[in-house]
Amino acid sequence: MNFMLGWNAPPKKAMSLGAILRFPDGRNMPDVHATLFDYGSAPVYLRLNLGCETPEIYRFQGSKGILEVTEFAITYYPQTGEDSAPSYYTSGYPQKMRDAYVAQWHAEHDPVPGKEPVLEGYTYRGDSWDDEKPHLWRYFQGVKNHQQVTEDAVFGNNAALACHMSNESYFRKSAVVWDAASGTIKSA
């Protein structure tokens, strides 16, 4: 993800939760682990589930839609930024107010039958964009031949810091921040 976005910095903050749900075999690391990272310009949510064959998917959500990157495809799902249904917050409204809001919303927003807008998405498919084998190959060739690898040690350190912050947050049961001045992970 950091490579795709061109980021070369550790997250400013991380908050994790998780549990040992599938493999209660004495391990101390969660097999279900979710973390929300604050990189300053964008929040990043990362989920790790051990013991299931879920595909690796990156989803980037923006004001124009969603870009989904998988091993075999890159797909763009356009979104207009406009509501496609009445607000779900109305369930807390009194019944009379809710009914009036829903009726008004449909009167103002429902498309004319046969004139519903169609948002066209795009999908680009390939054999496999799995970068693990090429990544490891470039690394070992770089070490063996004393050549520059794709990313430098600072990039690797920053990526590893995100993992360490996630784990520290899980064990502390609170948000953590990276203190660059002291070179330590601290509770937020």
Regions found by a protein language model. Give the residues of each.
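C-terminal glycine/acidic-rich active-site capping loop/insertion
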Residues: 2-6, 25-39, 59-151, 176, ...
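Rossmann-like dinucleotide-binding domain that binds NAD(P)(H)
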Residues: 1-43, 50-53, 154-157
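C-terminal substrate/ligand-recognition segments
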Residues: 151-152, 156, 163
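Short beta-strand segments
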Residues: 44-46, 56-58, 176
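Hydrophobic, well-ordered secondary-structure elements that form the walls
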Residues: 139, 156, 173
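Stable alpha-helical structural segments in soluble proteins, enriched in small hydrophobic residues
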Residues: 131-135, 162-173
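Short, solvent-exposed aromatic-acidic interface loops
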Residues: 49-51, 80-81
